[in-house]
Each structure stands twice: as C-alpha cells, then as structure tokens.
C-alpha cells in the first residue's frame, strides 16, 4: 500500500467515527382501536441512528442539564393522517402520525418525541389487517 492510500484510509476511519449517523429510517407501525374491526399497517419514517456522546467526569459537580446526552431526533417532520378501516360511526377513524423529513443529534424534545425507551414490544396487531398499506409510494 502506498502512504497516500494508507493515510486516506486512516483519515476516513477517523472522520467516520467522529461524524454522527442519524438519518430518517423506514419504519412500519401497526395501529388499531378497540372499537374498530381492523388493524392498519402504516409505513413511515422515523429518526434512528447513532449520535456521538461521552460520559462526563465529575458528575457530582455539574448541574443536571449538563448531564443529558444527545439522541437521534427530528429536525424537520410533518404529520400525515390515515383512516383506520372498520370503525363504527360514533368512533373517529383517523390516526395522525409523524413522518421524519430530516434528523439531527440533539436533546430529546418531549413536545413531539417520546423520550422514554419502552421495554415492552407494542408494535403488533391483535385484529385482522387490511390488505393495503399506507405510506411509501413505490
């Protein structure tokens, strides 16, 4: 290997480790309401990935806000609305969900993000699914 090639490899690896990998990622969610007959499968995008972080020494001497870590969160997003099939007339069949347009590494904003990691898997259907999916166009 030449010295130039070797140096460019080392530089590439160093920059790759220093840069964050936080991007919109395809995500399939299942939505159902107990009053409705069907479960709806929605394809959307969410922010997922790795953000550079570090643990601080001297935690006892720092204020709590200085101890928070960056997470992969929304920079720009929009809401879309889907209709859950098989709902009776007295039930509103609409469900709004976020679609990530761009992402960033930053503090988790509870105004529009769920900042708690759930240990229980809840993304499944207990009712029959309709044969169509809402979301990505092919």
Swiss-Prot record:
Transmembrane segments: none
GO biological process: G protein-coupled receptor signaling pathway
Entry keyword annotation includes Secreted: yes
Disulfide bonds: 22-72, 36-87, 39-125, 47-103, 51-105, 108-115
Location(s) in or outside the cell: Secreted
SUPFAM superfamilies (alphabetical): Cystine-knot cytokines
Pfam families (alphabetical): Cys_knot
PANTHER family to which the protein is assigned, alphabetical: GLYCOPROTEIN HORMONE BETA CHAIN, THYROTROPIN SUBUNIT BETA
Function as written in the Swiss-Prot or TrEMBL entry: Indispensable for the control of thyroid structure and metabolism.
Complex and partners: Heterodimer of a common alpha chain and a unique beta chain which confers biological specificity to thyrotropin, lutropin, follitropin and gonadotropin.
UniProt-recorded name of the protein: Thyrotropin subunit beta
Source organism: Bos taurus
Gene name in the database record: TSHB
């Amino acid at each position: 290997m030449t010295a130039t090639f070797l140096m460019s490899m080392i530089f590439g690896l160093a920059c790759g480790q220093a840069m964050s990998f936080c991007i919109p990622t395809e995500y399939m969610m299942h939505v159902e309401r107990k009053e409705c007959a069907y479960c709806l499968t929605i394809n959307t995008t969410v922010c997922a990935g790795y953000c550079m972080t570090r643990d601080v020494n001297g935690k006892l001497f720092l204020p709590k806000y200085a101890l928070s870590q960056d997470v992969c969160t929304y920079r720009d997003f929009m809401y879309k609305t889907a209709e859950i099939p098989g709902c009776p007339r007295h039930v509103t069949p609409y469900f709004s969900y976020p679609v990530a347009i761009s992402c960033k590494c930053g503090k988790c904003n509870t105004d529009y993000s769920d900042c708690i990691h759930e240990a229980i898997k809840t993304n499944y259907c207990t009712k029959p699914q309709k044969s169509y999916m809402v979301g990505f166009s092919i």
